[in-house]
Amino acid sequence: MLNTTFANAKFANPFMNASGVHCMTIEDLEELKASQAGAYITKSSTLEKREGNPLPRYVDLELGSINSMGLPNLGFDYYLDYVLKNQKENAQEGPIFFSIAGMSAAENIAMLKKIQESDFSGITELNLSCPNVPGKPQLAYDFEATEKLLKEVFTFFTKPLGVKLPPYFDLVHFDIMAEILNQFPLTYVNSVNSIGNGLFIDPEAESVVIKPKDGFGGIGGAYIKPTALANVRAFYTRLKPEIQIIGTGGIETGQDAFEHLLCGATMLQIGTALHKEGPAIFDRIIKELEEIMNQKGYQSIADFHGKLKSL
């Protein structure tokens, strides 16, 4: 019922973790692999291992979360070794998603060259929604720099590649970014990363709740679902059909998943809710989505995918 075709591969369902959640270590990744998730993605890696920002840097909130993690990860080679080994031992399984998030364009190019030269046959996600040069916006808010990077990437990269984007809030920005992305043989766009630089306050203590950046951090969870749905829809209606969409942001229930699929997402990533509930969330959310589809008389996701009605 939930069978999904994505990047020319077949998955039992559209659900996966969002990079950053439950995917830091091999143990985490193995738990995801053993769960009901249709697919899973590694922690966004940098060339070298990173400790990330000082604690506390992640706090669950009533309707979501705030974080300023600072890209903690065990380094590119740790994750590449894992995916290559896994690929060899489990050749019959669907492809693994491998996430990278270089601290500069040069670092992204270096990692993509290593992936290109390796035997990795899965899907790579390039995170364009993390810090760039100090004093400049994160890469995907710098349209010129994004276009320049992708031009360079596709001079050598021939494997399936998706990009993870921050949320946009201006219709003109959707137009500009879609025009850039449509130039390239991208496999997918992942919308959205957390909404940057929110602030959550503990009124009792009269203080912020996370330590880095004076308490400013990315907001996730139910708080961001309307923004995520808007971004999914905006890109679904603007991108060439060969570029598929992963919907991320505020997916906690079967209904949230249904709404993302209705807007045009093909795969769905869960972050905040997975952090709160653990991999058992996939069992629950699959049942809830199937129940909604049964109530509506839908046999498959294709029956309603992308078919959001306007008034």
UniProtKB/Swiss-Prot annotation:
Record-annotated active site: C130
Enzyme kind, highest EC tier: oxidoreductase
Record-listed E.C. numbers: 1.3.98.1
Reported cofactor(s): FMN
Catalytic activity, reaction form: (S)-dihydroorotate + fumarate = orotate + succinate
One of the record's GO molecular function terms: dihydroorotate dehydrogenase (fumarate) activity
Reported impact of R57A: More active than wild-type, especially with 2,6-dichloroindophenol as electron acceptor
Effect of K43A: More than 500-fold reduction of enzymatic activity with oxygen or DCIP as electron acceptor
GO biological process, one term: 'de novo' pyrimidine nucleobase biosynthetic process
One cellular component (GO) term of this entry: cytoplasm
Cofactor note: Binds 1 FMN per subunit.
Signal peptide: none
UniProt-listed Pfam families: DHO_dh (PF01180)
UniProt entry keywords in alphabetical sequence: Cytoplasm, Flavoprotein, FMN, Oxidoreductase, Pyrimidine biosynthesis
Main location: cytoplasm
Residues that hold substrate according to the record: K43, N67, S68, M69, G70, L71, N127, N193, S194
Associated pathway: Pyrimidine metabolism; UMP biosynthesis via de novo pathway
Compartment annotation: Cytoplasm
Effect of K43E: 40-fold reduction of enzymatic activity with oxygen as electron acceptor; more than 120-fold reduction with DCIP as electron acceptor
Subunit architecture: Homodimer.
Function: Catalyzes the conversion of dihydroorotate to orotate with fumarate as the electron acceptor. Molecular oxygen can replace fumarate in vitro, but cannot use NAD(+) as an electron acceptor.
UniProt protein name: Dihydroorotate dehydrogenase A (fumarate)
Species this chain originates from: Lactococcus lactis subsp. cremoris (strain MG1363)
